[in-house]
UniProtKB/Swiss-Prot annotation:
Ranges in a coiled coil: none
Keyword S-adenosyl-L-methionine: no
UniProt similarity note: Belongs to the universal ribosomal protein uL6 family.
One Pfam match: Ribosomal_L6
Record function comment: This protein binds to the 23S rRNA, and is important in its secondary structure. It is located near the subunit interface in the base of the L7/L12 stalk, and near the tRNA binding site of the peptidyltransferase center.
Positions of transmembrane segments: none
HAMAP family, A to Z: Ribosomal_uL6_B (MF_01365_B)
Alphabetical UniProt keywords: Ribonucleoprotein, Ribosomal protein, RNA-binding, rRNA-binding
Cellular component, GO annotation: cytosolic large ribosomal subunit
Alphabetized GO MF terms: rRNA binding; structural constituent of ribosome
Protein name as it appears in the record: Large ribosomal subunit protein uL6
Subunit structure: Part of the 50S ribosomal subunit.
Amino acid sequence: MSRVAKAPVTIPAGVEVTLNGQELSIKGGKGSLVRSIHAGVEVTKEDNVLKFAPRDGIAGADAQAGTARALANNMVIGVTQGFERKLQLVGVGYKASIKGNAVALALGFSHPVEHALPAGVTAECPTATEIVLRGVDKQLVGQVAADIRSYRAPEPYKGKGVRYANEQVRTKEAKKK
């Protein structure tokens, strides 16, 4: 059994967990999430604890048990605290703003780029060069951040582009004569 799967997921007060076969649904103060668990994983709920164990005779069940436990833990954290991802725009004239349910980006193209936000993700721009994405689903928040970053990833010479707030961009030295 994987080390991750051995640790149980504690369910805090105010969080409602429902197990329906292999479907796990978690409701909390910030929202609700539903996820289907791999068939090779056995999920049990005892008091305020979720336990995950691999089923016998299924290949890869050990790894799937650890994955299911990590996903369930992220669901609990998401509905209680939520997830946040910060992006920075580095470059002359690079700006971001919120237009309805979309993020409008001026990234040096001939036209502004508008990225529509999916349901469950909200965005705000504290400054013209910062974007803060928030939501309950860790995977969805990270995917939206990656999609926005992909419009203009940081280039290796000056570091201009869209980057994560904690990202260290490795710059190359310019060509010498």
